Swiss-Prot record:
Role description: G-protein coupled receptor for PEN, a neuropeptide produced from the precursor protein, proSAAS (encoded by PCSK1N). Acts through a G(i)- and G(q)-alpha-alpha-mediated pathway in response to PEN. Plays a role in food intake and body weight regulation. May contribute to the regulation of anxiety-related behaviors.
Name of the protein in question: G-protein coupled receptor 83
Signal peptide: 1-17
GO BP term (any one): G protein-coupled receptor signaling pathway
Highest taxon in the source lineage: Eukaryota
Annotated gene: Gpr83
Extracellular topology ranges: 18-70, 128-143, 206-236, 314-326
Pfam families: 7tm_1 (PF00001)
UniProt xrefs under PROSITE patterns: G_PROTEIN_RECEP_F1_1 (PS00237), G_PROTEIN_RECEP_F1_2 (PS50262)
Family from the record: Belongs to the G-protein coupled receptor 1 family.
Chain spans, region Disordered: 401-422
């Protein structure tokens, strides 16, 4: 049932008496909405439990009205949006246009790029617009849809990073076993999206749009979590489960997988006779590969740890909202969408070769087929490619030492574990 305005004012005054003075001064707009004639308008359509939930959320900070702060945030988030879209769209374009890059591993890379594009388009702008306008302008339906899209894209990104790590682990640790087929890759990606949807639905369902009269001419809205009773425990354990599924578990799997891969690559011996120059080149490549693996783990851990801990502490009521901290942590987490294309593609020599080939095709007319030189194929494709044609295998063997050709083995030091080409 609806609560009489007199009782609301009485309860509000009781809550104010228990709050610290600075908390009230941080919420001038909300205080105005909850006093006097505005109170009856604000709570006309809400129950007593709605009022309790809303008052509980008043402790979690207010919006900054500083134009300089808003301008800086717009510039900072625009930087992420531009670079993330450019990098991830280009990754998808290069992989789709090049038949040689169509593999299960490439599907995972594309899925990661799609998830990062979703984060860029559906997470960053909603957060920024809500802060700049100090109100929710997207309507009741988008209050639920945006929350679902935000969490779903984050789960897809984390799960895809985990799938890539597991795939690389299988390739390096068991090089003679068949690679994951494209069909299985599609199935794994479908499972990732189903899991992400399942994990994201509670966040989408437990959202509510609160509307209040800010002034005589302005009505503002807030899209807030609205959990069933006991709301505090529900919120706390939901965020705890999200923290484990979205951060701790993927980080553990990625760390273990890449640690084993790095150890395998570092300890493996070169097959056949090699010169000192070749040995030093292979050693440098080992170091570069291990550094890339460490970079993947460190960036994932550093980018997402602050925001996840902040949200978990907030839902546990251990801290109050601090806008400066929130947007610093949020920006840092969102910036991972710019790093992923760089780590998984730009640092990979094969991807750069394919990108240059694609750009050269766009710049000048292509030569007749008989005049083209065959593209170099990495030596490790001989052992791992499922459907190797005779010509490609012969070309690959041309680059291998004679001892390797006779043994049919592959030198693990020549493998790039985060390669997008299979």
């Amino acid at each position: 049932m609806n609560v009489p305005p007199v009782l609301l004012l009485f309860l509000l005054s009781s809550v104010r008496a228990t709050e610290q003075p600075q908390v009230v001064t941080e919420h001038p707009s909300m205080d105005a909405a909850l006093t006097g004639a505005n109170a009856s308008h604000f709570w006309a359509n809400y129950t007593f439990s709605d009022w309790q939930n809303f008052v509980g959320r008043r402790r979690y900070g207010a919006e900054s009205q500083n134009p300089t702060v808003k301008a800086l945030l717009i510039v900072a988030y625009s930087f992420i949006i531009v670079f993330s879209l450019f990098g991830n769209v280009l990754v998808c374009h290069v992989i789709f246009k090049n038949q040689r890059m169509h593999s299960a591993t490439s599907l995972f890379i594309v899925n990661l790029a799609v998830a990062d594009i979703m984060i860029t388009l559906l997470n960053t702008p909603f957060t920024l617009v809500r802060f700049v306008n100090s109100t929710w302008v997207f309507g009741k339906g988008m209050c639920h849809v945006s929350r679902f899209a935000q969490y779903c894209s984050l789960h897809v990104s984390a799960l895809t990073l985990t799938a890539i790590a597991v795939d690389r682990h299988q390739v390096i640790m068991h090089p003679l076993k068949p690679r994951i087929s494209i069909t299985k890759g599609v199935i794994y990606i479908a499972v990732i999206w189903v899991m992400a949807t399942f994990f994201s639905l509670p966040h989408a369902i437990c959202q509510k749009l609160f509307t209040f009269k800010y002034s005589e001419d302005i009505v503002r809205s807030l899209c807030l979590p609205d959990f069933p009773e006991p709301a505090d425990l529900f919120w706390k354990y939901l965020d705890l489960a999200t923290f484990i599924l979205l951060y701790l578990l993927p980080l553990f799997i990625i760390s273990v997988a890449y640690a084993r891969v790095a150890k395998k690559l570092w300890l493996c011996n070169t097959i056949g006779d090699v010169t000192t120059e070749q040995y030093l080149a292979l050693r440098r490549k080992k170091k570069t590969t291990v550094k890339m693996l460490v970079l993947v783990v460190v960036l994932f851990a550093l980018c997402w740890f602050p925001l996840n801990c902040y949200v978990l502490l907030l839902s546990s009521k251990a801290i109050h909202t601090n806008n400066a901290l929130y947007f610093a942590f949020h920006w840092f987490a969102m910036s991972s969408t710019c790093y992923n294309p760089f780590i998984y593609c730009w640092l990979n020599e094969n991807f750069r070769v394919e990108l240059k080939a694609l750009l050269s095709m766009c710049q000048r007319p292509s030569k007749p087929q008989e005049d083209r030189l065959p593209s170099p194929v990495p030596s490790f494709r001989v052992a791992w490619t499922e459907k190797s044609h005779g010509r490609r295998a012969l070309l690959a063997n041309h680059h291998l030492p004679s001892s390797q050709i006779q043994s049919g083995k592959t030198d693990l030091s020549s493998v790039e574990p985060t390669v997008a080409v299979s």
